[in-house]
């Protein structure tokens, strides 16, 4: 085990504070409509230009281990806020810096760190209540577009595209962001349930122009095992042929004699049929088959529940208005499942999302909700260069998270105004002792900082604007883009309540930990003297890669 360096008290806290300031100062220049860009050097390729706070924070590593600890803790504030609300990372960083700077001053003056933390927590809890009280629901398309616009750094086309996507697939629908081909942003909507499995044989194709299988009002057979023996299916195929309707088979696999017979039947026009593999793997496959069954009003034919292929009747099959099967995708449109059953299934999956701790599982469950509830929209981002494309895609993803947060918890006036209004609720808040009161005052002063930073970045006088906004009421605030005092909500300058709340709570939580730090332990860096010469020899080999 390598030797460790330990620092205590004031010495440790000052080092940590230096790291906090370096990271926060780099991040906070991006805040507001007139926030500046930060250029990030990459070890390969062109540098990245960004106005996204969390992207800047993630790039920062400091050489001094103790300073780096401070920087990493603030980075944690940005990451937590990003994970919870998808935006507000810069606001959270500014708040954390303000609380740490003020808090460490108070500790240096001899205050009790634990009481300071209790005071800060008390003030934040009260402020959060006020944020919820002034929050308004975000239901109409216009408000959604405004939230998207603000989060995408005042890019109105992004806000409009997100609002349009939400309108088409519903607020529960899945909206994904991809890199497009042209210069313009575009929106593609896939209605119904789509899963990423295509036809098992190109001989099923009946629309040569689009190279797809198109089935109108088909029966849908769902089976959780492989189908290799056609004899098991003969009674069912005869029944389907008599009905004159097409058939879609979704099974673990269809192979050998069974697939060959289906292809021949299809080509001769005896039964219009297509076969695809079931989506997903393992338990997820079973769940997705069950989803399709509920959507189409069918039953999954599974030996686990005593059902076999030989005994299947037509009323155990699902039905839909239309099914299209391509090389890689299958889309079921307008399944004839019971609405109440679909809603119950969606509620069940939502409950699983709340219970799940894995981000990957949550994402997959959310996709299943969307496929059952509305559909999938894809926003394709257009840009002239690769660098611009990456930067824009980041912004669109941010804006998308922010709009989801707004739909979830509502909206508050933006531009730092909501926090200024929340200050009023803690003016009369009393701590149990003097040190707690100082903690409450620290939180109160910190809540002014997002507004101060937005105004400073816009090149105006922060103190003057702050006093003017404080003396205002309700939604009155400062539009940094135009330099005017306006009604923030009417002007479309709004933030999701969840973003502001998460930023404040996460900042206070991590800053509280820093204020109450008394010792720091870090490894002493090893001096690697012997290796430099060897590496010099290796350097010559770099030329080999250039040939």
UniProtKB/Swiss-Prot annotation:
Q: List GO molecular-function terms, semicolon-separated.
A: ATP binding; ATP-dependent protein folding chaperone; isomerase activity; unfolded protein binding
Where would you say this protein principally sits, based on its record? Answer: cytoplasm
Any one GO biological process: protein refolding
What are its E.C. numbers?
5.6.1.7
- The portions of this protein that span the membrane are none
For this UniProt record, give its keywords in alphabetical order, as a comma-separated list. ATP-binding, Chaperone, Cytoplasm, Isomerase, Nucleotide-binding
What's one Pfam family the UniProt record gives for this protein? Cpn60_TCP1
Residues binding ATP:
30-33, 51, 87-91, 415, 479-481, 495
| Superkingdom to which the source organism belongs | Bacteria
Q: List the subcellular locations.
A: Cytoplasm
InterPro entries, per this entry? Answer: Chaperonin_Cpn60_CS (IPR018370), Cpn60/GroEL (IPR001844), Cpn60/GroEL/TCP-1 (IPR002423), GroEL-like_apical_dom_sf (IPR027409), GROEL-like_equatorial_sf (IPR027413), TCP-1-like_intermed_sf (IPR027410)
Does the keyword section mention Flavoprotein? no
Spell out the disulfide connections. none
Provide GO CC annotations from the record: cytoplasm
EC supergroup of this enzyme: isomerase
Q: Show the catalytic activity.
A: ATP + H2O + a folded polypeptide = ADP + phosphate + an unfolded polypeptide
Family recorded in the similarity comment: Belongs to the chaperonin (HSP60) family.
Q: How does it assemble?
A: Forms a cylinder of 14 subunits composed of two heptameric rings stacked back-to-back. Interacts with the co-chaperonin GroES.
Q: Which HAMAP family match?
A: CH60
Q: What does this protein's UniProt record list under function?
A: Together with its co-chaperonin GroES, plays an essential role in assisting protein folding. The GroEL-GroES system forms a nano-cage that allows encapsulation of the non-native substrate proteins and provides a physical environment optimized to promote and accelerate protein folding.
What is the protein's given name? Chaperonin GroEL
Name the species this protein comes from: Dichelobacter nodosus (strain VCS1703A)
What taxonomic ancestry is recorded? Answer: Bacteria, Pseudomonadati, Pseudomonadota, Gammaproteobacteria, Cardiobacteriales
């Amino acid at each position: 085990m390598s030797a460790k360096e330990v620092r205590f008290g004031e010495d440790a806290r000052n080092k940590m504070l230096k790291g906090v300031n370096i990271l926060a100062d780099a991040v906070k220049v991006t805040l507001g409509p007139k926030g500046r860009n930060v250029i990030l050097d990459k070890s390969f390729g062109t540098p990245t230009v960004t106005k996204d706070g969390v992207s800047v924070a993630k790039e920062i590593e400091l050489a001094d281990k103790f300073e780096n600890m401070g920087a990493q803790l603030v980075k944690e504030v940005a990451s937590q806020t990003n994970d919870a609300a998808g935006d507000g990372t810069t606001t959270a960083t500014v708040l954390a810096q303000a609380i740490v700077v003020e808090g460490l001053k108070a500790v240096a003056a001899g205050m009790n760190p634990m009481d300071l933390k209790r005071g800060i927590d008390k003030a934040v809890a009260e402020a959060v209540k006020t944020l919820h009280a002034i929050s308004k629901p975000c239901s109409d398309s216009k408000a959604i577009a405004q939230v998207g616009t603000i989060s995408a750094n005042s890019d109105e086309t992004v806000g409009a595209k997100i609002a349009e996507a939400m309108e088409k697939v519903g607020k529960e629908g899945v909206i994904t962001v991809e890199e497009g081909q042209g210069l313009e942003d575009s929106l593609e909507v896939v209605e119904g349930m789509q899963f990423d499995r295509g036809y098992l044989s190109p001989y099923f194709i009946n629309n040569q122009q689009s190279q797809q299988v198109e089935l109108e009002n088909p029966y849908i057979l769902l089976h959780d095992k492989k189908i290799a023996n056609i004899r098991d299916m003969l009674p069912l195929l005869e029944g389907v042929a008599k009905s004159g309707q097409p058939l879609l088979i979704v099974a673990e696999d269809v192979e050998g004699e069974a697939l060959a017979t289906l292809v021949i039947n299809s080509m001769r026009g005896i039964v219009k049929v297509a076969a695809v593999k079931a989506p997903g793997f393992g338990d997820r496959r079973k769940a997705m088959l069950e989803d399709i069954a509920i959507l189409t009003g069918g039953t999954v034919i599974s030996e686990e529940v005593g059902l076999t292929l030989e005994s299947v009747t037509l009323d155990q099959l699902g039905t839909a208005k239309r099914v299209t099967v391509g090389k890689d995708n299958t889309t079921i449109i307008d399944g004839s499942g019971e609405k109440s059953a679909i809603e119950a299934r969606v509620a069940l999956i939502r409950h699983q999302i709340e219970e799940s701790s894995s981000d990957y599982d949550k994402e997959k469950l959310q996709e299943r909700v969307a496929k059952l509830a509305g559909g999938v929209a894809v926003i394709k981002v257009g840009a002239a260069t690769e660098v611009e494309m990456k930067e824009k895609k980041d912004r669109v993803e941010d804006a998308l998270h922010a709009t989801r947060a707004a739909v979830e918890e509502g909206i508050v006036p933006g531009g730092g105004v909501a926090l200024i209004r929340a200050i009023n609720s803690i003016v009369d808040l009393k701590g149990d002792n003097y040190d707690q009161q100082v903690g409450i005052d620290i939180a109160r002063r910190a809540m002014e900082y997002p507004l101060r930073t937005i105004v400073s970045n816009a090149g105006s006088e922060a103190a003057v604007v702050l006093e003017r906004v404080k003396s205002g009421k309700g939604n009155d605030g400062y539009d940094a883009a135009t330099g005017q005092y306006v009604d923030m909500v009417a002007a479309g300058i709004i933030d999701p309540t969840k973003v502001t709340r998460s930023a404040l709570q996460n900042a206070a939580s991590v800053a509280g930990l820093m204020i109450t730090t008394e010792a720091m332990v870090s490894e002493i860096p090893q001096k690697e003297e012997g290796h430099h010469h060897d590496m010099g020899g290796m350097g010559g080999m770099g030329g080999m890669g250039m040939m």
